[in-house]
Amino acid sequence: MVAAAKILGAGLATIGLAGAGVGVGLVFAALINSTSRNPSLRPQLFSYTILGFALTEAIGLFALMMAFLLLYAA
């Protein structure tokens, strides 16, 4: 019963990875949209995009870490 709860909890924790994937897609979609509107701001927008990508991906990595902790922690 405990093993089933661990597997279920890990599966639910990986839902955060889907959110991270959507978030990264939205970040880069906003970069493409903004660059097409004002190409001269591309260097500044790209640095903001990389920051947004890193923060969004960190949430996904935290979700993955929680899934591994639920599966393999004692």
Curated annotation (Swiss-Prot):
Q: Please give the CDD domains that the UniProt record associates with this protein.
A: ATP-synt_Fo_c_ATP5G3
The membrane-spanning stretches of this chain are 12-32, 50-70
Instruction: Site (Reversibly protonated during proton transport): give the residues.
Output: 57
Q: What is its main location?
A: mitochondrion
InterPro entries linked: ATP_synth_F0_csu, ATP_synth_F0_csu_DDCD_BS, ATP_synth_F0_csu_sf, ATPase_proteolipid_c-like_dom, F/V-ATP_Csub_sf
What family classification does the UniProt entry report for this protein? Belongs to the ATPase C chain family.
Instruction: Give the source species.
Output: Rhizopus oryzae
Gene Ontology cellular-component terms for this entry are: mitochondrial membrane; proton-transporting ATP synthase complex; proton-transporting two-sector ATPase complex, proton-transporting domain
Question: Is Membrane one of the keywords?
Answer: yes
Q: Which Pfam families match?
A: ATP-synt_C
Entry function: Mitochondrial membrane ATP synthase (F(1)F(0) ATP synthase or Complex V) produces ATP from ADP in the presence of a proton gradient across the membrane which is generated by electron transport complexes of the respiratory chain. F-type ATPases consist of two structural domains, F(1) - containing the extramembraneous catalytic core and F(0) - containing the membrane proton channel, linked together by a central stalk and a peripheral stalk. During catalysis, ATP synthesis in the catalytic domain of F(1) is coupled via a rotary mechanism of the central stalk subunits to proton translocation.
PROSITE patterns with a match to the protein in the record: ATPASE_C
The way this protein sits in the membrane is described as: Multi-pass membrane protein
Protein's recorded name = ATP synthase subunit 9, mitochondrial
| Keywords, alphabetical | CF(0), Hydrogen ion transport, Ion transport, Lipid-binding, Membrane, Mitochondrion, Transmembrane, Transmembrane helix, Transport
Task: Name where it's found.
Answer: Mitochondrion membrane
Q: Which GO terms describe its biological process?
A: proton motive force-driven ATP synthesis
User: What quaternary arrangement does the UniProt entry report?
Assistant: F-type ATPases have 2 components, CF(1) - the catalytic core - and CF(0) - the membrane proton channel. CF(1) has five subunits: alpha(3), beta(3), gamma(1), delta(1), epsilon(1). CF(0) has three main subunits: a, b and c.
Gene that encodes it: atp9
The reply on keyword DNA repair is no
Q: Which GO terms describe its molecular function?
A: lipid binding; proton transmembrane transporter activity
